[in-house]
Amino acid sequence: MSGGKGGKAGSAAKASQTRSAKAGLTFPVGRVHRLLRRGNYAQRIGSGAPVYLTAVLEYLAAEILELAGNAARDNKKSRIIPRHLQLAIRNDDELNKLLGNVTIAQGGVLPNIHQNLLPKKSAKPSASQEL
């Protein structure tokens, strides 16, 4: 009999693969699962829930960082700062709705001038001004 674990003799041991790698994700599925278990959100956590949640978090992070990178490039900067995150989120309708109540430190405000404060455009002088 061969020693060790059962199976075919001479077969190479398969290297373990993380759940993140199996799902094709960069964010850690195991850590999200641990946080879900320790967070007292439910008594039991299914095996697919942390994978799905991790995929959603990774997608949101990629979306925000892409828009913030575009904002940084528009401002001729190579580093993303909180101002670029603020501009990216507030100029996107869906992200603004999702993060509407979120305050970003050092984010500033969107440039906006109310219509009532803008100077009135006069196409031609009125009859009272001609006399």
From Swiss-Prot:
Coiled coil: none annotated. Pfam families: Histone, Histone_H2A_C. A motif ([ST]-Q motif) lies at residues 128-129. Keywords: Acetylation, Chromosome, DNA damage, DNA repair, DNA-binding, Methylation, Nucleosome core, Nucleus, Phosphoprotein. The modification N5-methylglutamine is found at residue 106. GO terms for molecular function: DNA binding; protein heterodimerization activity; structural constituent of chromatin. GO terms for cellular component: extracellular region; nucleosome; nucleus. The modification N6-acetyllysine is found at residues 5, 8. InterPro entries: Histone-fold (IPR009072), Histone_H2A (IPR002119), Histone_H2A/H2B/H3 (IPR007125), Histone_H2A_C (IPR032454), Histone_H2A_CS (IPR032458). Phosphorylated to form H2AS128ph (gamma-H2A) in response to DNA double-strand breaks (DSBs) generated by exogenous genotoxic agents and by stalled replication forks. Phosphorylation is dependent on the DNA damage checkpoint kinases MEC1/ATR and TEL1/ATM, spreads on either side of a detected DSB site and may mark the surrounding chromatin for recruitment of proteins required for DNA damage signaling and repair. Acetylated by ESA1 to form H2AK4ac and H2AK7ac. The modification Phosphoserine is found at residue 128. The modification N-acetylserine is found at residue 2. It is found in: Nucleus; Chromosome. The record marks 120 as: Not ubiquitinated. GO terms for biological process: DNA repair. Core component of nucleosome which plays a central role in DNA double strand break (DSB) repair. Nucleosomes wrap and compact DNA into chromatin, limiting DNA accessibility to the cellular machineries which require DNA as a template. Histones thereby play a central role in transcription regulation, DNA repair, DNA replication and chromosomal stability. DNA accessibility is regulated via a complex set of post-translational modifications of histones, also called histone code, and nucleosome remodeling. In contrast to vertebrates and insects, its C-terminus is not monoubiquitinated. The nucleosome is a histone octamer containing two molecules each of H2A, H2B, H3 and H4 assembled in one H3-H4 heterotetramer and two H2A-H2B heterodimers. The octamer wraps approximately 147 bp of DNA. PANTHER family: HISTONE H2A. The [ST]-Q motif constitutes a recognition sequence for kinases from the PI3/PI4-kinase family. Belongs to the histone H2A family. This is Histone H2A.1. The lineage of its organism: Eukaryota, Fungi, Dikarya, Ascomycota, Saccharomycotina.
